[in-house]
Design a protein with these regions (language model features):
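Short, low-complexity disordered leader/linker segments with a strong preference
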Residues: 1-36, 404-407
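Beta-alpha junction/loop-to-helix N-cap segments that form part of ligand/metal-binding clefts
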Residues: 28-30, 34, 49-55, 67-140, ...
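Extracytoplasmic "Venus flytrap"
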Residues: 30, 34-58, 80-87, 109-110, ...
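Venus flytrap/periplasmic-binding-protein-like
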Residues: 82, 129, 136-139, 210-211, ...
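Extracellular/periplasmic Venus flytrap/periplasmic-binding protein
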Residues: 91, 136-139, 145-251, 292-295
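Periplasmic-binding protein-like
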Residues: 96-109, 129-131, 173-178, 226-236, ...
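Extracellular/periplasmic periplasmic-binding protein-like sensory domains
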Residues: 246-322, 396-403
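Segments of small-molecule ligand-sensing domains
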Residues: 308-321, 331-392
Length: 407
């Protein structure tokens, strides 16, 4: 455990039994001296590579506190390890609310854990803000007014890839390798929705588990299908293995990977830059390992932040950039709260963002929310890796989000 300023960074794999504790009322204001923020992350287990999100958020609030806090209040950020287990996520969240008396939960990772805690937090009127998941079920203000997403939705992202395939490769054969969880399913569902009648061109789709030891067998099956387009939907470490395996089999289809895997440092470079050349993705944040941004003022601020407040993590980690951007967005919400940092006003301000541009987001990406719109980021850009850098093409995409959100 480390304590820096007023930020508490705690990594706990499991909790002992919890005593019954009285809950703060939703309208109860935060302390005059601090705002207490709870967070749950997979610092261990199969998705531990995304623990970098929470670590960057902790460091960001260290920086905020070093600069005097927000509206005179310091930030106390308490983050814990759920090992990607929904039951543990619920137990930890209850403890953060009932024992640590957090004012809100922020940025907890993953669809299963956030779905497991959603009912509890809404029942107790605790803000569940900017969850680290693109599942639209976590952005339903009518049913769950205390839960709000942050990143572009998985389904809409999937529709972007489907629209790209229809526009550039309308009669080509497709294969899909997708992660066998809610994350992978929603991405693939978006592709299926976007392809419509062209789903007949999907020759093979294979679901894989995060710890799958048979990737070579999967790639062999996909190659034998004779497909022209290979869509991968999963995490960066697996994307690197898949791209490298395909190249080793002398198979060079049009490669599409999802945004979470579109990291030069975490996926393209480990796969081999030559092997990764030509990979297509969609993005909304700048890749810190992309030399295209080396002179960008916002990325210079990012590197300075990492050097001063977060030296334990690589400056090239895209997951860390995600955490930085999400924490920056929460800081904007808290600034808008002024002196009223009650839970109700925190939600009110979170639902009142107008054209907020995260500093490390791609140009023209904006956050907008309202009481009826809990998907803050509804824009992405198509990008292609040229062996060195991501090259954007086309315009900022919004139409897929309008269509993808329809139910």
């Amino acid at each position: 455990m480390r304590v820096t300023g007023r930020v508490l960074f705690v990594l706990i794999a499991a909790l002992t039994s919890l005593g019954a504790m009285s809950l703060q009322r939703a309208e109860q204001p935060a302390s005059d001296k601090e705002i207490r923020i709870g967070n749950v992350m997979p610092y261990s287990g199969p998705l531990s590579e995304f623990g970098a999100i929470g670590q960057a958020e902790a460091a960001y609030f260290d920086m905020i506190n070093a600069r005097g806090g927000i509206n005179g209040r310091k930030i106390r950020f308490i983050t814990r390890d759920d090992n990607s287990d929904p039951a543990t996520a619920l137990e930890l969240t209850r403890n953060l609310v009932e024992t640590e008396n957090v004012d809100l939960m922020f940025g907890s990772f993953g669809t299963p854990g956030n779905l497991a805690t959603r009912w509890y937090l809404n029942e107790k009127k605790i803000p569940q803000l900017f969850v680290a998941s693109g599942d639209e079920e976590l952005s339903q203000p009518g049913a769950f007014p205390w839960t709000m997403g942050w990143q572009p939705s998985f389904r809409s992202e999937g529709r972007i890839y489907a629209n790209y395939i229809q526009a550039y490769y309308p009669r080509k054969k497709i294969v899909v390798l997708w992660q066998n969880d809610q994350f992978g399913r929603m991405l693939y569902k978006g592709i299926q929705e976007g392809l419509g009648d062209l789903n007949r061109l999907v020759r093979v789709d294979i679901a894989f588990d995060i710890a799958d030891q048979h990737l070579d067998g999967h790639i062999s099956i996909l190659k034998r299908s004779g497909a022209d387009i290979f869509v991968f939907l999963g995490v960066p470490s697996t994307a690197a293995k898949v791209i490298k395996l395909a190249a080793s089999m002398n198979w060079h289809p049009v490669f599409i990977v999802n945004d979470a895997s579109a990291s030069i440092a975490n996926a393209m470079a480990p796969a081999g830059l030559e092997n990764s050349a030509g990979v297509i993705s969609a993005a909304f944040l700048k890749d810190p390992s992309d030399p295209a941004w080396k002179d960008d003022p916002a990325m210079k601020d990012w590197f300075a932040f990492m050097d001063k407040y977060h030296q334990v993590e690589s400056t090239n980690n895209s997951a860390a950039v995600y955490g930085y951007a999400a924490a920056e967005a929460l800081a904007q919400v808290l600034k808008q709260c002024g002196d009223d940092v009650s839970r109700e006003n925190i939600m009110r301000q979170a639902a009142s963002l107008k054209n907020h541009h995260p500093s490390v987001a791609l140009p023209d990406i904006r956050m907008n929310t309202s009481p009826h719109s809990y998907l803050p980021i509804r824009q992405m850009r198509l990008v292609q890796f040229d062996g060195r850098s991501w090259q954007p093409f086309g315009e900022v995409i919004e139409t897929a989000f309008t269509e993808g959100a329809a139910r």
